[in-house]
C-alpha cells in the first residue's frame, strides 16, 4: 500500500465533502431568503359569462400512457410536440396544446421556418387546441423575445383559425408582452406560493398570487385572458433547487380559493406539473394520490368535473 498517497486522498475526499456541504447550505439559504408578499391584494375578478366552451384544463409534462388517468381526472387537454404521430395519439375527447416554444431567453424548440411548416400542417387539425409559444420569457434580459413571440402569434392568428396562442409568465417584466403588443391570446401566470423550503411548512405565501395578478393588471393583461397555473409540485426529491414543497390538501384548497376569487371563470387552467422533472419538479401531481403525499388528484378530479 502506498501510504504516501493516503493524505492526498483524504484531502480530496474532505474537499469534496466540503463542496457538497457548501452547495446544500447555499440551497438552504436561497430558500430561506424568500419573503412572503405583504402588499395590496388584487381586486376580485369579474364573475361574468363563462368562456365559450367553459374552462379547458391541462396538466403539463405528460406522456401518452398518462392520458387515460388524466381523462379520468377531468383534464381535456394534453401537451405534445408538433409531431404527427403524437398529435394523432391525442385521445378522443381531448385536444393538444402544442409545445413549440422556448424557456426564458433560450432558443425556440422550432426555428421560425420549421414553426411555419408546423402551423401549416396542424393549423386546422381538430385535435389541436393551440400553440405554446414561450415559457417564462424575460424581455428584461432579452428584449428581442417580444418581437419573436409577436411574429409567431401573428402567424397562428392568420393560419390556425380557431386555435389559440399561449405563453406562460412569471414575475419578470410583463408590459412588453401584453396582447396589445404581441397579440397573444392567453397568458399563464405561475406564482408558486408554497415556497421557502422543500419540506412542507404551516403556511404558503398565498399573497404571491395577488402580487402576480396585480403585475398583470398593471402591465395591461386583461383578466379574461389569464390562465391560472396551479402549483402541483414540490422539490423534496428533485436534484436541483430545493425551494418549493408540494402543497398539503388544505393549502391546495386555499390556492384554489384564491384563484377562484381573482379569475373565477378562466378560459384555461393549468396544473404544473403532472410528470416529474429531475431538476425542478419532484414530487408532482402524478405522485399526489394520498399516503406519503397529499391527495391532490382527488381535489383536482372534483374540481374539474364540477365546473
Task: Set out the residue ranges of the language-model regions.
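Hydrophobic membrane-insertion alpha-helices, especially the h-region
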Residues: 13-25
Amino acid at each position: 500500500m502506498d501510504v504516501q498517497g493516503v493524505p492526498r486522498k483524504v484531502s480530496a475526499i474532505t474537499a469534496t465533502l466540503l463542496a457538497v456541504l457548501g452547495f446544500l447550505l447555499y440551497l438552504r439559504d436561497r430558500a430561506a431568503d424568500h419573503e412572503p408578499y405583504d402588499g395590496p391584494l388584487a381586486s376580485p375578478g369579474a364573475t361574468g359569462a363563462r368562456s365559450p366552451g367553459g374552462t379547458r384544463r391541462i396538466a403539463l409534462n405528460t406522456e401518452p400512457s398518462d392520458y387515460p388517468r388524466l381523462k379520468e381526472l377531468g383534464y381535456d387537454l394534453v401537451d405534445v410536440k408538433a409531431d404527427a404521430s403524437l398529435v394523432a395519439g391525442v385521445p378522443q375527447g381531448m385536444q393538444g396544446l402544442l409545445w413549440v416554444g422556448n424557456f426564458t431567453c433560450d432558443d425556440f424548440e422550432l426555428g421560425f421556418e420549421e414553426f411555419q411548416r408546423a402551423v401549416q400542417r396542424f393549423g386546422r387539425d381538430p385535435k389541436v387546441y393551440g400553440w405554446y409559444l414561450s415559457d417564462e420569457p424575460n424581455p428584461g434580459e432579452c428584449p428581442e423575445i417580444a418581437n419573436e413571440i409577436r411574429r409567431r402569434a401573428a402567424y397562428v392568428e392568420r393560419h390556425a383559425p380557431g386555435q389559440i396562442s399561449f405563453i406562460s409568465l412569471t414575475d419578470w417584466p410583463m408590459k412588453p408582452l401584453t396582447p396589445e403588443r404581441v397579440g397573444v391570446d392567453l397568458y399563464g401566470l405561475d406564482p408558486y406560493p408554497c415556497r421557502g423550503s422543500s419540506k412542507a411548512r404551516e403556511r404558503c405565501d398565498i399573497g404571491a398570487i395577488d402580487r402576480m395578478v396585480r403585475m398583470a393588471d398593471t402591465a395591461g393583461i386583461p383578466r379574461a385572458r389569464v390562465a391560472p397555473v396551479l402549483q402541483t409540485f414540490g422539490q423534496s426529491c428533485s436534484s436541483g433547487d430545493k425551494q418549493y414543497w408540494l402543497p398539503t390538501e388544505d393549502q391546495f384548497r386555499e390556492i384554489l380559493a384564491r384563484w377562484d376569487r381573482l379569475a373565477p371563470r378562466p378560459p384555461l387552467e393549468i396544473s404544473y406539473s403532472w410528470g416529474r422533472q429531475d431538476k425542478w419538479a419532484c414530487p408532482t401531481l402524478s405522485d399526489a394520490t394520498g399516503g406519503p403525499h397529499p391527495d391532490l388528484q382527488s381535489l383536482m378530479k372534483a374540481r374539474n368535473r364540477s365546473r
